[in-house]
Structure formats: C-alpha cells, structure tokens
A protein has these predicted regions:
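Acidic, Ser/Thr/Pro-rich low-complexity intrinsically disordered segments
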Residues: 18-66, 75, 79, 88-89, ...
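Hydrophobic or amphipathic alpha-helical targeting/insertion segments
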Residues: 81, 85, 95-98
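Predominantly extracellular/luminal regions of secreted and cell-surface proteins
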Residues: 95-124, 281-313
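Sec-dependent N-terminal signal peptides
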Residues: 3-13
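Intrinsically disordered, low-complexity boundary segments flanking structured domains
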Residues: 8-9, 85, 113-119, 215, ...
Length: 376
C-alpha cells in the first residue's frame, strides 16, 4: 500500500509540473479602445498569466470562470498583429497571435448556416470574430453594397496558427454565386469583387481540415477560429518599393483597392519597421527598414547591355511587369569571393514562382535555382 501511494504521488507531481498547453484563443482580436471577453482551450492550471508584445493589451483573468479573460485594448495601440503568451511557474505555452483592429468588431451569432438566414452586418468596415464550431459548419454574413464599390474581404486564421484551409463565396440576395476564393496570401482566403448594382449581398465561409485527409466534408471544432475584415473602403495590398533603407527618406506608393492618398513620405526611417499612416482598414502599414542599401529596379533591364549595375551588399526591390519579363543586374566579383542571392516573394504573400540564374559577362549560365527549401 505504501509503495502504491508513493508511485501515485510521483505521477501526480509530474503531471502538475508540466508547462501549460493552450490550443486555441477566441476571439483572436479586438478593436483598439475596447474590451472583449475571450476564452482559451487546452490543459493548464488556472489562472494563467499573460505576456503581451504590446503594453496596451491586458488580459485580466475571470477568477470565477476558468479559461476566460477580460481583454482591454488601449486606444493608443497601433493596429496590427501581436504575440501573446500564456504562462505559469511551470513554463509557457507557445505564443499565439492577437490582432488589434481599427474597425468595429462583430461577434458571430449562431445560427447563421443558411444563405437565406444570414447574420446581418449593419455597416462596413467590420471585423467578424467567428469560429466553425462543428463539422459541416457554414457561416453566412449579409451586408449592403452600392454600385461601383469594391468589396474586400480577408480572413486571418491559418496565418494566426489555426490549422484549417478556409474558403469564401459571395452571393447576391437571390443566391447567385458572384465570386469565390480559396487561397490568397496563404491558405487564408481574400475575396475582391466590384459591385455592379445596389443591394444586399451574402458572404459565406467554411473550412477544410489541414493537413488534409480523405474526408472532403467541411471541418469544424472549438479551435477552428477566424477573423474576417470586410470593407468597401481603402485596403493596402503592398507597397512600391517594398522596403526603405535606414536613414534614407523615400516616397512610398501604396498599392491595393479603394485607395485615395496613394503616396506616403517616409523621412529618416530607423529601427526594423517604419509605420505608414493610411486610412485603410488594414492600416497602418508596416514597412521593413533595411540596414543596407536598396536599389529600385529601373526598366528596361531585360538583357546584359541594359542590366542595372549594383554594388554589394544590396537589397533590390523589383517586379515582373508582364509575361516574359526578365530582370538583369550586373555586379563585379573577384576570384575566390562567395556571394549569396535570395529572392523573397512567395513568403511575402505574392504568387510569383521566381527563378534566379547567374551568368558571366558573355551570357553563359553558371548557376540556376528555381525553388529553395521547398518554397517558390
């Protein structure tokens, strides 16, 4: 009996000494200057402490409700994604992403499965905070648009660490399919559509399991959480150029939809990121600041005679303007030197499948690389 007691005691101690496990957080965001009630799921001893990347995001545990927090977001918190980490004396759970938005939060209200019985979103822009709560769940949201307006609807889920592959479908009031998107900047969908007539429209969403299995049915569960920003106003897709150099003032063009003031001045940038002000629902825009020189591509540079001359180290901002476009850059190198060339595009949310090739001054190909580390 004494031996059995000792064995059980040791087992119990080892279980309670484990670091907390937090499988999901819902909702995964809130509007700045607001409060929200959030819940976590997993295995942990209550209450857990919370570290936030932003000082203005506070998680206050509800002592009488295990797993629930009152989240307070200060007005001065810059909108965007932030890391939060749940921890106790035994360790920490992996960090999770929490989004702070400018637009009004709209919590999902079930039932909203049917296209003809959707949840009504009173005004745009809005950020839907929802979840596909069970297998087969479809969420439907209705809103109004006017002729000529461009709708932008973007989901954040997979990019926030949620294991699902979602889709979006836009219908008119009669149920006719108008637009569809499955994957955009990642497995998360982004739907763009220009309205052709005044009316009410319904955005429907569902998800598949990821990684995929042999089941083709829509997936769902407590951890299948998402946020969707819906707007008929400004939205930034990217900038040109894609970065700035430290201490170098630049004019940056915002590229996207429904934009009015498309050019922003960046003066003497420093640090790792420069925050660009914009009225866009997904603004402000965080622009990388480089600690090296940047060259912006100058066309034409399709052949060796017109190649842009660069000096190392350098980052080049460029674009493939049309099918068949080839960009060339000339540089000097000495025998025995080693140089590394990296292209970032797919990782930054673009669909380009780029290729790098190295030629000598006579045009002879010395090396070529298409895909590196299983990425495009």
């Amino acid at each position: 009996m004494r031996a059995l007691f000792a064995t059980l005691f040791i087992f119990s101690t080892s279980v309670h000494a484990a670091a907390p496990q937090v499988d999901w957080l819902f909702p995964i965001g809130a509007q700045r200057g607001s409060e929200a009630l959030a819940q976590i799921g997993g295995k942990y001893n209550w209450p857990l402490k919370v570290w936030s990347e932003a000082d203005g995001i506070k998680f206050v545990p509800e002592k009488e409700k295990k797993g629930f927090y009152r989240i307070k977001v200060n007005k001065d918190v810059t909108p965007g994604p932030y890391l939060v980490r749940f921890y106790d004396a035994n360790g920490s759970a992996p960090p999770r992403v929490f989004f702070v938005s400018k637009a009004v939060d709209v919590p999902e209200k079930e039932p909203n499965n049917e296209m003809l019985k959707p949840q009504v979103v009173a005004s745009l822009p809005a950020v839907i905070q929802g979840k596909f709560g069970k297998g087969g769940d479809v969420d439907s949201y209705q809103f109004s648009l006017k002729k000529g307006q461009t709708l932008v609807a973007q989901m954040d889920a997979y990019t926030a660490g949620v294991s699902m592959d979602a889709l979006m479908l836009l219908r008119d009031a009669r149920g006719m399919k108008l637009a569809f998107n499955h994957d955009a900047h990642s497995l998360d969908p982004r739907l763009i559509w220009k309205c052709s007539r005044d009316g009410d429209y319904v955005l429907q969403m569902a998800c598949f399991k990821f990684p995929a299995n042999s089941n083709s049915s829509f997936d769902g569960g407590a951890d299948r959480v998402y946020r969707v920003t819906i707007t008929n106003g400004p939205w930034v897709r990217h900038t040109w150029p894609a970065a700035v150099s430290e201490g170098v003032s630049s004019k940056i063009r915002l590229v996207g939809w429904n934009l009015k003031n498309e050019v922003v001045s960046v003066n003497d940038p420093e640090g790792e990121v420069s925050v660009l002000p914009t009225e866009a629902a997904n603004g402000p825009w965080r622009l990388p600041v480089l600690n090296r020189a940047q060259e912006v591509e100058k066309e034409p540079n399709d052949n060796n005679e017109t190649a842009n001359l660069v000096r190392f180290p350098v980052t080049i901002s460029a674009r493939i303007d049309k099918p068949g476009d080839v960009d060339r850059y000339a540089f000097e190198a000495k025998k025995g030197e080693r140089h590394r060339f990296d292209m970032d595009s797919f990782e930054d949310g673009f669909l380009l499948d780029g290729q790098l090739s190295l030629e000598d001054s006579n045009g002879k190909e010395l090396s070529v690389n298409d895909d590196s580390n299983k990425k495009r």
